[in-house]
């Protein structure tokens, strides 16, 4: 596995010379004008006339997909508690396009609350943003200027990873016949604390800048027909979760470990860490050619002081290109339509349009045609469904609205939201939604906003304390067992035949045996069918709902026709709604009076019902449950540590006492990262998962080291005491002996003296 470091030398010069100056040019009032495209599809197409230095530029824009309905922003308060909310308000804001009459021009703009973004012409870039303190849709125009500099990428270090083993294709291999088609990749973006502070320490402002960066990334990737969808933005607004100092490769390896524990990854997703460095020697690090390896799909992009958003975007595009398997261009053989090619060092500090070279395009075509990008989606998942127009007063929060409390007469939060403009009133935190109180404040975190409707298959959702709406519905992943293994969870309900029959005709009616289904659903009429025709035997449990009836009196539910069949001592019943309209003329040959397999009502078996061992019904067909569940993304025994179950987002929903995302033990924790329930985050998941065992091992180590030392010390003290007693006893005996000897000598002398 190669680790690629994008090395930028001479950054002392960059600090002084490469700092791009925003040269203010003028103020202007963009004018929205009509066009044939805008008239045909005004929701997706718009045209503005923007005058710069007396010259009108006609900017044609098309709606750009950057966010999905599942995109979230995560941030941390001063207590390091994480707060999450969807990015729904930003979904309809992003556009890209071109300037009419200027070949190869590129424009990337956000159109909510004014125009904000970049216009890239041949060799010059203009920025535009609203003057928020001034009324009247006045905007300021500035030019991005880069001073000449001799800063280059250090070739030996930068290209050290690129050898014969990693060669994308042979130069003789032609790719002219290969056609590209749209692909999508989801990106988790993490912003470190230093960059958060550098960008103004404001959650909304930093979020807007990140979205602006990815919008420009997508504009530059248009040649490759590749679109980046923001899966989540996590801003470390309180403190960094890993160390972001030191060499970029070490930061990448730390981020690599962090993402394994904290991000729920899918094969088509990638994680990027945005880091601020005042004067770095490296601008990034990544694993080349590993975009489809979810274990290594990550990169670190460093943001030097003074760098423009456009230049930083180029760094990210280059890193992403390396992730995809592209290489830096050899300037003597690789050429592009513009003055600067994207995969060259010069692109970082050049204004205007940057194109991918012929070499990069050929490499990308080759990789995509040789199954190198099979993980990338060919259709965007959960992309926004656009309506023909936004409607203020329909009670739905749509793009550009700050609130929507309903119409003027039925507004749910009259003190908080202007029902005519869908704007918040003064001092209001919120103006609509289940998590917005009547006094215009967010309801406290962990307030229930949507109760579970099925004890086995549905989960309760909570307000997160920072968003006015209840989060998306969460429930047990389709295909998980319920009813003691006799049924499957599907769309948040336990799909048992008994409950379906009781709901339809009541009085304890139960699901019928298979021979009742065989008798009725092979008829091919309005009481027994699989849509437009009779059911084949393998699908008979997936057509009309057949129940048993144990009462002597007839079923008397209004507007319900009933057929009775006596089979093997069982009274089998099937029903039909006579209020149904007859089929169109083209379908009169059908005896069932149903138009298609999708033309169903409550008299049919529900999708998700059991139709055999590990088999479930879907659109009147019996299918194997393995096609319903993605065990590669979420396997409860592994991802959830055996203390949770996978939800409809393929994330773990943890038991009480276990903390998401991987269900590690933690007091009072439960739920998932999707249901809004918050747990104080003083101790991170890594601290619980790694430091706790380490602490235990440390105490064990201290104990096992201390015990022998204590025993030895005690033994020494005891020995020393005995030795001291022995010495004392010896000294006493010695003194006594000397005394006796002295006395004896005295007596002897005295005797001798007397004798003389």
UniProtKB/Swiss-Prot annotation:
Q: What is its main location?
A: membrane
Q: Where does the protein end up?
A: Membrane
Q: Which residues lie on this side of the membrane: Cytoplasmic?
A: 720-756
Quote the biased-composition stretches of kind Low complexity, using this chain's numbering: 735-756
Q: Which residues form the propeptide?
A: 17-142
Report the record's disulfide bonds. 292-375, 334-359, 336-341, 449-470, 634-646, 640-652, 654-663
Record's protein name: Disintegrin and metalloproteinase domain-containing protein 5
Q: Which organism is it from?
A: Macaca fascicularis (Crab-eating macaque)
